[in-house]
Design a protein with these regions (language model features):
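N-terminal leader/signal peptides at the extreme start of proteins
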Residues: 1-10
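A generic structural micro-environment signature
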Residues: 17-22, 42-45, 68-69, 81-83, ...
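Short, glycine/small-hydrophobic-rich surface segments
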Residues: 62-84
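C-terminal juxtamembrane segment of a hydrophobic transmembrane alpha-helix
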Residues: 14, 18-41
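Short amphipathic alpha-helical patches
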Residues: 2-3, 26, 42-46, 59, ...
C-alpha cells in the first residue's frame, strides 16, 4: 500500500491553524471598529461644519436682500458615532459679542464656531436674545426685519 504524499500529521495541525486564524481575526476586530467610529465622527464633523456655514450664509444673504425676506432651511445633526450634538447657540442680543455667531457645542465639550462677517449680520431669536437649540434635526425659519434702523435676522425653530 502506498503512503499519501505530504505531511502525515497534517490533520493534527488543523486545530492549531484554526486557533491562530481566530486569534488574528479577534485582534483585528477592535482596530477596525475604532477606525469605523473615527470615520463616523469625522463625517459628522464635516456635515456639521457645512450646516453651520449654511446658517451663516443664509443670514448674510438675507442681510443683503433686506427686510421682508424670509428663508427656511432644514438641518440634520444626527450622528451614528460617539461625537454628538449637545446644543446649537444661534446669535445673541443685537450689538452683543455673539450676535453674529453660530456655535455648535458637542457632547465632548468642543465648540465649532462660525461668524457672519463680510457682510456682518445681527442674528437673534424673536425675543431679541440668542437662540438655543437642542434638536439634532430641525427646520429653521430665518427672516430679515428692520429694528431701530438696523437689519436683524430673526431665527426660530419650526
Amino acid at each position: 500500500m502506498r503512503r499519501p504524499l505530504g505531511d502525515a500529521s497534517a490533520l493534527e495541525s488543523v486545530p492549531l491553524k484554526l486557533i491562530i486564524v481566530a486569534a488574528v481575526a479577534t485582534m483585528s476586530v477592535l482596530p477596525a471598529a475604532q477606525a469605523l467610529a473615527g470615520l463616523e465622527n469625522r463625517e459628522f464633523a464635516r456635515r456639521a461644519e457645512v450646516q453651520l456655514d449654511l446658517i451663516v450664509t443664509t443670514a448674510q444673504v438675507l442681510t443683503v436682500q433686506g427686510p421682508g425676506n424670509v428663508r427656511t432651511i432644514n438641518l440634520d445633526f444626527m450622528s451614528d458615532g460617539s461625537l454628538q450634538l449637545d446644543r446649537i447657540l444661534v446669535g445673541g442680543p443685537a450689538g452683543g459679542v455673539n450676535s453674529s455667531s453660530v456655535r455648535l457645542v458637542l457632547n465632548n465639550g468642543a465648540v465649532m464656531t462660525r461668524i457672519a462677517q463680510d457682510p456682518t449680520c445681527a442674528i437673534c431669536s424673536p425675543s431679541m436674545t440668542g437662540l438655543v437649540l437642542y434638536q439634532a434635526s430641525m427646520e429653521l425659519r430665518m427672516a430679515a426685519v428692520l429694528e431701530n434702523r438696523t437689519t436683524l435676522i430673526i431665527v426660530e425653530a419650526l
